[in-house]
Amino acid sequence: MTDLSIVSVETTILDVPLVRPHKFATTSMTAQPLLLVAVTTAGGVTGYGEGVVPGGPWWGGESVETMQAIVERYIVPVLLGRGVDEITGIMPDIERVVANARFAKAAVDVALHDAWARSLGVPVHTLLGGAFRKSVDVTWALGAAPAEEIIEEALDLVESKRHFSFKLKMGALDPAVDTARVVQIAQALQGKAGVRIDVNARWDRLTALKYVPRLVEGGVELIEQPTPGEQLEVLAELNRLVPVPVMADESVQTPHDALEVARRGAADVIALKTTKCGGLQKSREVVAIAKAAGIACHGATSIEGPIGTAASIHFACAEPGIDFGTELFGPLLFSEELLQEPIRYADGQVFLPEGPGLGVELNMDAVKTWTRN
């Protein structure tokens, strides 16, 4: 058997341009920074993971720069000499050295899974119990352009059968203006595609109580994290108020968070990101709690590149608890392809990459081009 002991860990920061600016409630970005983590074994196998947050530290306090420092200074010493098949022992040891920093830990967790699976000649989903499906539904995030342009973009995507469900970001504009814009789009797409919204936790209780019902009346099919993540009692109040699903994102980053959401009845759906949870292992714990509580899970995104997206696809295809679709569209937002063969999107689905490990191969020329100097 190939020697699985870790002999080197390398990190690289990339800045990959996007096809258009991507707007959140508090920021926008024209390029997505990625931290590439490469774990190499004595047997000559390299596995890759990706540290990524949506546009910087505004979301969870981490950035590619902090992730790189944490991985290189504190996590690498835990890894060297260990086997890539020791994930269940390695990750708790990392927890003892580094608190929080879940996005950095996710990059390492995925790199270990990729290296181990490649060493065995099997896909990552095999290590997770095996894939029970080969594709999952994928929602597309629409931009911040005027409503007429957004409607045209969405209808074009429906016509081409690439997407049948769309998300709109809110929270950056005046709530009345924001709501009117979203309702205009939702009504234009009614009967053709679903529309959901994400406020990125930027509304207070009174604003949410005023505008969330208007959004639902206007045809919005799902409300994601309208209020601050820690205010579970407000999220629960909104969940009782409206007849459409309420989804928790910022409110759930750990298994304990999922337990609290379940106890309070704060959400019908959890936005499960393998990044914010700290990797594939911790993500399984979150999904297990959600399943036990009867809460659905949605395969959400931090705008990952192809490595992070491939990892989340493997997870979603191996985990029946991801039962509310996904938004694993990250690579489609990038203007530059980082893989030798792109991840496949068609018919409103994203397809499981085939082959050992994550089933994708980096184009190292493209990686070099977009490496930060």
From Swiss-Prot:
Any one GO molecular-function label of the UniProt entry: manganese ion binding
Entries under Pfam families matching the protein: MR_MLE_C, MR_MLE_N
EC top class, as a word: isomerase
Swiss-Prot/TrEMBL catalytic activity: (S)-muconolactone = cis,cis-muconate + H(+)
InterPro entries: Chloromuconate_cycloisomerase (IPR013370), DgoD-like (IPR034593), Enolase-like_C_sf (IPR036849), Enolase-like_N (IPR029017), Enolase_C-like (IPR029065), Mandel_Rmase/mucon_lact_enz_CS (IPR018110), Mandelate_racemase_C (IPR013342), Mandelate_racemase_N_dom (IPR013341)
Family: Belongs to the mandelate racemase/muconate lactonizing enzyme family.
Protein name: Muconate cycloisomerase 1
